[in-house]
Amino acid sequence: MYQAIYIQQGENYAKTVHLKDDNEGWLHFDYKPTYYKLNPNGEFKTLDGKCVSPTDRYSKDNYEIDIPNETRVLIEQYLEEDEPPKWHNIVFLDIECEIGGALTPENIKNSPTKITSIALYDKSTQQTICYILDESKSMESFEENGKSIIACYTEKELLLKFLDKWEELEPTIVVGWNSEFFDIPYLYFRMLKVFDHNTAKRLSPLGIIGNLSKYGSVATVETQKLTKDYLDLAGINHLDYFNLFKKYITKQEPSYKLGDIGEKYVNLGKIKYEVSLDKLFKEDKAKFIDYNIRDVEILIELDKKLQFIELTLNICHLCHVPYENIYWSTMLNEGAILTYLKRQGIVSNNKPTTINPELRLTIGDEYAGGYLKDPIPGLYSDVIDLDFTSLYPSIIRSLNMGVETLIGNVKIRDKYDSNWTLLDLKALRPSEKITIENPKRQVTQITAGKLIEMIEKNKLTIAASGGLFRSDKRSVVCDVLSDWFDKRVEYKNMMKDAYKVKKDPVLGEFYNKRQHAFKIKLNDVYGCFAQNGWRYTDGYKVISNAITLTGQRLIKESILEMNRMINTEIGTEDVDYVITSDTDSMFIRVGDVVRYRWPDLDVSDRDARIAKILEIASDYQKQINKYLNKHVRDLFNIQDDHYFELKQEVILERGYFAGKRRYAQYIINKEGVTTEELDIKGLDLMKSNFPPLFRKFGENLIQQIMFGKQKKEIDLLISSFKKSIAGREIVEIAKPTGVKKIREYIERGPTASKIFSDLKSKAPINTKAAIYYNDLLRFKKLDKKYPTIKEFEKIYYVYLKDNPYRLDCIGFYGVDDPPEIIEFIEKYVDKEKTFDSTFLNKLQGVYDDLKWSFPSLNEYANKFFVIS
């Protein structure tokens, strides 16, 4: 099975394939792609039913002219194989360099400062190595606790020793954190500066460094300007764990710094230090080495727990694509479907943007998303949810959606118009004129009666958007989704058998990875339909709208039916029991139903109450699925099986809903199993740009509310916290931020008679703070000793009280700042204003949601509280 692939473009369209196989090693061969031309006697059929024959001559009228060559080769060479290779040489890497300004792409390309250390871990040998620059020759190389520390007296020596080891290890996969943006490009360009291209290209086993764009084209760095796209070390797969993490863990993290992620997920953070990193390097090399190695150790522990590398390999081999394609669902799903069709002997169509290049200009056209019901903000108890199982894949399969089954659509009024189901058509006057269009965008009018007749006679399915699909043949996307569903079920059963019957955890984990790969693929197909350049979409987002608007209609109809059922049962009228809904789920408060069905139940008996709530959830799940079974057939004219099903997932003891996708949930039962979980998302109290102290307190405050603390206790927590602010270090309460623009907001710089710059009227607070810091640094003649704040750097800022300079705010780095400036900030920092401007309105927002009166936090009020 393949481990790496690189295709080298030669002269006159000649191509050389470099393919590394786990059994045969490196294979090198010339390659010419195969296209397919129309031929009434051709031995192959296309997806749209035409006869074709193979040819190696390019023509814009041929089929399969725009398939990436890497995908072509991998499908041809490994058509019947989906498994990952038996082995890989995986190396984890982290580099450190002297501080030399903001890490912009241009600065990385210029690579102005020395690389001071390189830490790596070879997974095959479990060997950790750190190459450390020691120009003072104060240390010798040594081994300790299984780690090799290699002292290098010049940067050249460090880089050459690293390259020697790199070539010895022969990595097939290199892993870092944000290494796509920084480590690998900086390493290459620094080698280019210190040595030459011949030395720098040793990073690639093929001696080729390419700049791989995110759309698959490759050019050498000599002919293409460095952009934010990553450098391609030809012959080595570069998997940036930062990007993998953001792909697989879709919930927003407060911070994506490696140390913060490490602490949260594997209880392993960065090595702490009190000075700047440059100063640490000069004054404490042992700690600096530990700092460098720790970054690699965090990566190792993250992958041990999350196993994203193994998951990536499983997905990419299922799809027959290079590993770097893992971030783009269109490439993955295109590869998977091409493989499926090739196994059937079917030739694929070209991309819509190849057939009609003008579609590239409409790539940003909008389409409707999922329906989110606005909650009435508040704290709710005894809440259940009902979730659609794989809603979007189920819509695609149930309505047989696909580019080859789409026959046309109703011309809708706007992207939210979801009232074109068969039931909607039947509610119109039969003579009412409706505008419809075919896949070629040709428009005509038809009466509602004639359209209904056409739908029913031809057994067409109709989406909520008015998209029309034939049902006499299955779309290839539906076939692939069905195949993936079946395989996922098969692997899940094999996983359970391995764990429970065979007692083989290794085999169980193997099957678990396989089923997880299929789960991910099932859930990301629908998004590809919105990409005009995806091979299996219509190019005009007709299918995308059909999917999302049908999803909207289903969740809305389900909400109406759920409210009708509860109101009917307990005798209320028009009461909304559905608190909120997301794209595929709804949260329902059932406390009134519990009290109605069991008026004598002791609600303080938690286990008894949960049992009754589970009974209610099971009952309503059966009722609403029975309703859906008939209703979806009437709505969408589904003749055969459909795949729509609502399932109860969780029970919340309490749920705080502040707005769309902004909530805290105290989960006490998950899929019928008792649990104790807090799920918090999107709340203002926990924003990533909050001071860490405030963010931590906000999280604790929400937890206490969810665990049932009363208002008086919450009041006391807030009052006590505000009082404690006075004794906190400034870095704890300062607001962390980035600075994007500095020069743009300076009207006039300082003069001999004026210390501070004149700023433009709309200068943001963080920019003002940075400029004032720089001006004060220069005024105190400290700018030769300490760096000024530059654009794109991370800083902190605070508000100031009345001070001799009449500044209202000031920024600082938070590490290794001049004592003179820190002394000034500590003397004049306005901690109360910092608290009020950053945090107070967020706290008041929570109280407003909970219908609580906000406590007075002044000193007079504090005497009524006992604060330890």
Put a short name on every predicted segment.
Residues 143-149, 168-172, 281-287, 318, ...:
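Glycine- and acidic
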Residues 20-21, 278-403, 407-410, 416, ...:
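Common nucleic-acid-contacting/processivity interface regions adjacent to the catalytic cores
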Residues 128-130, 138-141, 146-149, 153, ...:
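Active-site-proximal helix-loop-helix substrate-binding element of RNase H-like nuclease domains
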Residues 1-170, 294, 298-317, 321, ...:
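DnaQ-like (DEDDh/DEDDy) 3′-5′ exonuclease domain used for proofreading
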Residues 162-186:
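Proline-aspartate-enriched helix->loop->beta-strand connector
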Residues 614-868:
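C-terminal, non-catalytic extensions of nucleic-acid polymerases
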Residues 586-620:
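Catalytic palm subdomain of template-directed nucleic-acid polymerases
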Residues 270, 555-583:
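Active-site palm subdomain of RNA-directed nucleic acid polymerases
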